[in-house]
Amino acid sequence: MPRGCAGARFACNACLNFLAGLGISEPISPGWAAMERLSGLDAFFLYMETPSQPLNVCCVLELDTSTMPGGYTYGRFHAALEKYVKAAPEFRMKLADTELNLDHPVWVDDDNFQIRHHLRRVAMPAPGGRRELAEICGYIAGLPLDRDRPLWEMWVIEGGARSDTVAVMLKVHHAVVDGVAGANLLSHLCSLQPDAPAPQPVRGTGGGNVLQIAASGLVGFASRPVRLATVVPATVLTLVRTLLRAREGRTMAAPFSAPPTPFNGPLGRLRNIAYTQLDMRDVKRVKDRFGVTINDVVVALCAGALRRFLLEHGVLPEAPLVATVPVSVHDKSDRPGRNQATWMFCRVPSQISDPAQRIRTIAAGNTVAKDHAAAIGPTLLHDWIQFGGSTMFGAAMRILPHISITHSPAYNLILSNVPGPQAQLYFLGCRMDSMFPLGPLLGNAGLNITVMSLNGELGVGIVSCPDLLPDLWGVADGFPEALKELLECSDDQPEGSNHQDS
């Protein structure tokens, strides 16, 4: 279960007296103790959202319905989802806030929760291939979620080329999950057998009235100076260490050092997607031959695919691209919140023509970047964002689009690698054949490439804005070519000694 903010669960008498002076006299109920407050990083994704920047985490599933007990019908699918959601409180929780709340919003149970508000059904146009599926999913990815309800939707897309398949697109707000938490949330709807019984229902965390939300928020707000007293020294120390690293050339790629590309620019409201799938055995073969990590291979695949795409359009930069990469700290952070991540910047050297040299350069650069990110620590970014509010981040979103990025984007793309299950899964009784993760676009970086493994396959999901990149299939189709290129040059490499899986 997600961790709540322990420091915001109890109010002092001074807080209650203050609120009473404002004329608020609702009783304190036991539900307050269970109320879960968003962390600053969770709330960041609410505050930064705009009509042209929906901040949702999505995945597209291709399902074989022949395994569904009793045979597939939309009604059976609806009933199965209803049972499974009862065992996952995260699906039934919505935002709650009040104008008197000085801290971030809270999660409370939706007393009026109904599956029909979240489950959608749509038919795929003929011929029902991957391009038709991508067109529908791109449209869905650009739609905002209703903040008055739990922040998720599921779309069942019927009418594919095969009668025994359906596609499902699950969309969850980034305030609810990060990549790892999203995979965990998805697992609540899966089983290892198609006829596995639905899990037992789990009670939610309850609700919170205006007094409870405001009083606990006042406590959290009042504690910020104490927290700031610890964050500032840690930040100063980090800056000093970074300066020393820079002198020795041991820093990650710097923000605003990225070259201009066609996918850097103002975002529109629409989204388009493309996807592809790779054999994990081939990915691991490259990893072992070069003695690098899976992450290194993923970056090398991106570099190769983007090199091919940019060359075809005559716009390949002479400098390496820069990607911002979310780094999960779920196992390192003791901070509350559902999003447990920090970020690092890594170079994507698409300008290097030799694939062997390219992957070696990537591995060396990633080692430095990960070491630098580890030195910064898993919680420093989280701690600073905790102090921000909707006013500050809203102002940032009004200012950032007017900053010229012609010569120096903060970064070119978002690149994420999410570990996935290595077993055959059944989604509400339907065999899961493929899974393609889709991340959000942020700032003026109009390209997100997210990969996730599933049962021996690596799903690659690509998201952009059609105002910047009207056709993404050139990027998607470059991934198999990039893998083939690495496999061919890896045949001449000795077995690597560094067989890492991360």
From Swiss-Prot:
Q: Which InterPro entries match?
A: Acyl_transf_WS/DGAT, CAT-like_dom_sf, O-acyltransferase_WSD1-like, O-acyltransferase_WSD1_C, O-acyltransferase_WSD1_N
Q: Which cysteines are joined by disulfide bonds?
A: none
Q: What is its EC number?
A: 2.3.1.20
Reactions that this protein is recorded to catalyse: an acyl-CoA + a 1,2-diacyl-sn-glycerol = a triacyl-sn-glycerol + CoA
Q: Tell me which UniProt keywords the record has, alphabetically.
A: Acyltransferase, Glycerol metabolism, Lipid biosynthesis, Lipid metabolism, Transferase
**What is the active site of this protein?**
H174 (proton acceptor)
Its top-level enzyme class, in one word, is transferase
Q: What GO molecular function annotations does the UniProt record carry, in alphabetical order?
A: diacylglycerol O-acyltransferase activity
- Write down any Gene Ontology CC term: plasma membrane
Q: Which domain of life is it from?
A: Bacteria
Q: Which SUPFAM superfamilies match?
A: CoA-dependent acyltransferases
NCBIfam families on file: acyl_WS_DGAT
Q: Could you tell me what this protein is called?
A: Putative diacyglycerol O-acyltransferase MT1809
This protein's species is: Mycobacterium tuberculosis (strain CDC 1551 / Oshkosh)
